[in-house]
UniProtKB/Swiss-Prot annotation:
Self-association and partners: Part of the small subunit (SSU) processome, composed of more than 70 proteins and the RNA chaperone small nucleolar RNA (snoRNA) U3.
Predominant location category: nucleus
Stated name of the protein: Nucleolar protein 6
Ranges for region Disordered: 1-51, 1146-1199
Pfam annotation, one family: Nrap_D4
InterPro entries noted in UniProt: NOL6/Upt22, Nrap_D1, Nrap_D2, Nrap_D3, Nrap_D4, Nrap_D5, Nrap_D6
GO cellular component, one term: CURI complex
UniProt keyword list: Chromosome, Nucleus, RNA-binding
Subcellular location: Nucleus, Nucleolus; Chromosome
Amino acid sequence: MLRNKRKAGKLVRAPQKAARIDSQANAHAEDHSDLEHSAPSTDDGFDEPKPTIAKKVSLSTAIPKKNKFKQRDDTKNVKPPTLEEMKELRDTQNLFHSNLFKLQVKEMLEELQLKQKYTDFIENWLESFTVFTRQLKDGLMERSHLEIPLKLSQKPTGFVFSKPTREPYLIGAAATGTLLGPKIVVDVALEMPKESLHKEDYLNLRYDQKRALYLTYVTERMKESPAYAQDQFNFNYYANNPLKPVLELTPGTKQVNKHLQVRLFITAPLSSFKPGRFVPWNNNIRPSYYGDEWDEKEPLPSTQHYNANVLFDLTLSENQTHLDKAFKGRRNFQDGLLLLKVWLRQRQLDIGYSGFGAHILSAFIVYLNTQRILHHSSSSYQVARTVWNQLANTDWTKGISLSLVPIQTEELNKFAEQYDVCFIDFTGQHNLCANIPLYLYQRVREEAKLAVELLNDMKLNSFPLIFMQKCPLYSRVDNILKISNYSCINQMLTLHSQPRFKYDFAKYGYPQLLQLLTELLKKGLAERVHSILPLETATPAWPVENKAPVIGNYIQLGLILQPEHAYEVLNKGPAANDDPEGAEEFRRFWGEKSNLRRFQDGSITEAVVWGSAQDSPAKKRLIVRQIVLHLLEHQLQLDSKDVQYIAGELDQVYKLSPWFKVNKLKTKLSLDQDTDAEALSPHAIRSYDELARQLHGLNDLPLEIVSISGVSPVFRYCEPQPVLPQARLVENRILTSSIQRVVIQLGQSGKWPNELSALRALKTAFLIEIGEKLEAQCHLHWMMSADGLLVLKQGYCFLIELAHNKELALLKQEVTERGITTYIDNAASRSLERQHYILPKVSGALHSLHQTYSAFGSTVLLAKRWLATQLLDDGLWPDMATELLVAHLFQQRYAPQPIEAPQTGFIRFLQLLAFSDFNGELFLLNFNNSWQEQQVADLEHNYRSNRQSYPPLAVATSYDMQHAGRLWTSEESPSQRVLGHVTRLARHALEIIETSLLSKDLRFVRPAQLFRASNEGYDLVIQFKPDLVPNSLSYDLGSPFVSFSQPNFNLTRAGSGDVARIVGLLRSAYSDFAAFFYNPHGGKELAIVWRPPTEFAAKPFKVTELQACSPCGNGRVQVIKETLVEDFKLLLKDFYLRIATPEELKREQREHQKPKRYFDAKQTEEKSTPKPKVRKANEKEAPPKKKRLIKSSALKALK
């Protein structure tokens, strides 16, 4: 037993030592980092083993039982495990679900430790600043050269500066030892003496004015001091609060100026005012201060938020003192708080006026310690886990308290009634969560609950999901509402904000808007919305010489929808007979949208209808948008043009092209011109279902059809091209724009031949017989092709393939030199197995996923369209890889709520491409949890140990069997270069989206900005003949090379796929010399990038290296680009129109030359072009119609 423990102990320690060596090497290699690797703490806060356990162990090793049989004693040379080894082993087993997770946490904590140079600088700076404050002198503040960082309604006069009587001190993370990079912010507090304040300064913002003046005076003296001559001075608002200006000082020292910033707060002692002056139910801003009249008989409205704003300063010193006592010398608490801060920052829940700051988490750790939920010896992991667990399971809306003096339940309830969230500080006077809205607090709880669930999932490495992945709040919401029009903001505040909110927030517009809009939307959307979250960005700092900016005239809200109710087309009100007052209120709230309606159950009630049940999914996803805009217009008099509601803007890219007219289609289906690929998929699926029933019902087949599976993307709602019923039979040929593949399997029989070609011939005979039966019994047209049986049904073309296990076995069969038959996987067998056996299962699983998450299919459509418009076809980036990566997003719990908006799903897909570690991460989709935990662990272990045997992008499903990780992608598709290219494209796209989303002035990104490739970086562009390449049926956002012109929607012969086939030939023959890019969705240009010049250098003549080479003398050969271009033309044959460089095409655009892309393009004439073709186009030549008339009259004369 001890021997096993000892071995396990070694296994635990060895990776730690290796990880420590690696981390130290990285620390030496990256000296510019603002973080350093400190030696791990010997006291990690875990419980030491009890002495009784140690005694038992020593007894069992010291007095072994005698055995009468002579045995070899293996324990003589084995040292007993140390207490530390036993402790680490027990901790790994009991606390962490894997040794890897523990090592990752430990390594991250070591990397987060502050470098000594920063610690020394902070101590020295604080000492020098203390000396500086001692040198300050009392006096009247005269005219300042700096602007006061506060918008004052009255100009201050006669401010007398009093020298601080208390030395400046560190607050926040710098005091608790939990500073976090990459930008280290050191908070320093300077306390105004009590003499600077008068007893009436609690009223009408006087305290805030004096605080700002005090800060201005200290800043001006600092700028005059030689000690700070090289430093940069800026003012900023703490937490976007215009009443909380702070000084941001960037030191001029080169060693730290890039990564460190000092922030100076001005505070005041708690004894400056009478106790109870700032309790939440008191009023400290009189209506007369803003020129308002108030009835003296009415009680003054409470100013609980303003009171909390002042109490933040007054209680800061005492709160910090207690936090310092709790964290000082406790590395486990400090490291636990660091883990929580990383988690919070990655989710951007700590930004802005309503942010859930890290100081709340530090106070909560102390609270849990005082409640004996956390122990002093708890490890950092236990601290973080306990905080998450308690956050998820405690309710702060009823109030919790850290007060040293016990607070009565009635008083705590009275406190809690004034705020959405209540957490009383050590003084018992200040609510630490005064500015946090209810929805944001609930969001924090949900994220904490998710973190605990991820930790409990033994099948998952939860470390990157919790700590490494960036989860900006805008990527967690489904819809976004932006209001930035200054006049509209003022109008809303003036007409609709209640006076008590104006006094409560000291006329600051942002929280008033947040309160007004949240209440309105909460009432109007009700069960349709899960959360309404403020999306804030930090206010930028400004030079101390400039005036303070006006903030709060802009608001942005994120809506997380409730999938069960968000898309309901009806708002049903109360019945007028039963509840006349309720019905009247309903009509007043909804206005003209409300109508009296009679329902099938006989009830007659007020109701609002937002659409019909037959509307497309895209239209239903905009119902919430319709409701919000109506409420803003009806209740707040906001016109829709003054509001930006972001929902479904990118859906345009998979809509049907407006150039294609559906009314010309001969079909019984009722199709709308404004339809899209998502709405058209059910029509194709219903046609497939009917075909499947007809196949099952065929009579007199030699073998019964036992399985039918649709494997085309349309059957799982993943086809970005609108699939229209336009296939038709013309001169015994089926013309169509797309083919839907179907795989069938027949019943068992032992009469199938054992030779591959004979078996395939028999399969063809079976398919022909099925076609004849379909024609005879179901009146369907059919044709045979090289790939299978083509069947025309209801305007759709289906390709039926026959799968048989023996064909797969014969493909794998090989005979050795000794005549032994072996079965070995090869490219052909893997392709057949994927197409006929694995893809049907995966396709069914993805279809089921779409039924569970309605946004899955449309997210795939956006992802596929984006990749295609970046000139990445299936040969460079497999379509199935895109589908599986999106499915991975929906399967993994990255967020507390599933994705409801395709636009949000697309943003998360871009984040996945931009920030994933493709070299170290295997994307596994365990459909229906069909793989056991051990199978998943074995695959991941094999992936890590044999990484070089897997493709650059490794995607696996639970149906892949022995091919897991190697089936859906390959070394060339996508290659390492293409993967890097896609990563850069995704990061650039995210930058564009984030800039447009978070900017106050910009509107949301237009689809053309994302879904059109750049025309930079290509060497050549080959244009195809436009009449031979049909346009995409989806909305065309244009080519990066050539302007728009008349589109071409001609149908091609079923199964031709000429462009894709030719590009595949070019890649197979010339991929060593050039890379080929084109848009598979109707692209009419082929962009070429040459390989590096070394591939075209002259080299010695070798028989094995003569591909595409030409002799260049002296027994050497060389690949010549001009020769390759001629080869490209030869392979393209009739498709080739002309070849040009991107620069030439740009010049044509600038010179307004006629675009050479579509029907009006004239083919570039070669020297060998015969002249009669030119004469044929001559308008002066006699028309052929005249010739026919002459010929016709001659024929009549012969009669």
